[in-house]
Amino acid sequence: MGASFGIALTLVIFAGSDLFTGHTMFMTLGALRRRISLTDLSSSWAMTWLGNLAGAALLAVIFVVGGGGAMLHSKSQFLMTVATAKMNAPAIELFARAILCNWLVCLALWMAARMTNDTAKCVAIFWCLFAFIASGFEHSVANMTLLTIALLGNHPDTVNYAGLAHNLTWVTLGNIVSGALFMGAGYWFASRMPQPDLAPSMEPAE
């Protein structure tokens, strides 16, 4: 799963799509640099989050209507086990795992933005996404799709809409902390620090 999940972020970057978790970093940078207002920041976050939710729900419906493979027909399937764990995890665990997750995702976006070689971009995206999936971290937009698919399948009582709201609330907040504070504000602060002049002096030696 971790080896294949990188295609999602690759499609977002190369197709020029909008991803909420990426906006937490880029829009924060724009606001701190006074390129956009706080109103622009909040409206961008809200519209992107809602747009990602609508897209994730539509994708989940199409996937289920298309049969959904074998993962939707049994309450004991791996998908339902994962959904149950995500929907019933303590808030602090979801929050912490979401911080770590979007830190990796935003690093992938940041590196891709600085690279000109498409192959290098794909490699950077792959390893960052592989790390967050393999570590079991929490990504709000990924969970929108995964948990909606679980709700549309033959799910146990532990998979429900209250659990969906619980997960998305804490995961979204954690994603915002790492994207806006650790990455956006962090790089903004680093760029304002004076840089040492490493160029050799052109003055003649005495």
Task: Tell what function each PLM region has.
Residues 1-206:
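Alpha-helical transmembrane segments and their helix-helix packing motifs
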